[in-house]
Amino acid sequence: MPEIKLTSEELKYMSLFQDITGVTARDCIIDDRNNRIILLINPESMGVAIGKNGLNVRKLEKLINKSVEIVGYQENLEDLVKNLMSPARVKTIKVVQSNSKKTVYITVEPQDKGIAIGKNGRNVERAKLILKRYLDIDSVVVV
């Protein structure tokens, strides 16, 4: 796993998240292209972090004027990918390496393909950002 360095802006968002939710974020990724921040937390804290009816997330979004996405972090690739693609149902995950580039092929239920990809590919982009940061994976393909 590559060493993760956090910027002062990422640390600021993580601190704000903890103040609002009481949950410690493991990591924060700022995605300016989609005007959002992605927070990785321990999966068992997901309910507390989101808050009743999404109250904590909405409060944070209002404060920072960005969309907030929370992902349950897992050490192994398979569980992490399932969390990243949720609520889409993942059938198989295959890693292919060619010319020093790693690609993850994620097969989902046919009716869940749109959910897995997301509007304008934002869910695939989120998966790519996180998998690149933690597992040095270069691209993500949903099939």
Swiss-Prot record:
InterPro entries: KH_dom, KH_dom-like_a/b, KH_dom_type_2, KH_sf_prok-type, NusA_arc, NusA_bac
Entry keywords, A to Z: Cytoplasm, RNA-binding, Transcription, Transcription regulation, Transcription termination
GO terms for biological process, alphabetical: DNA-templated transcription termination; transcription antitermination
A Pfam family matched in the record: KH_2
A GO-annotated cellular component: cytosol
Coiled coil: none
Transcription as UniProt keyword: yes
Chain ranges passing through the membrane: none
One MF annotation (Gene Ontology) recorded for this entry: RNA binding
Subcellular location(s) per record: Cytoplasm
UniProt keyword DNA damage present: no
All copies of domain KH, residue ranges: 34-100
SUPFAM superfamilies for the chain: Prokaryotic type KH domain (KH-domain type II) (SSF54814)
Family named by the database record: Belongs to the NusA family.
Role description: Participates in transcription termination.
UniProt name for this protein: Probable transcription termination protein NusA
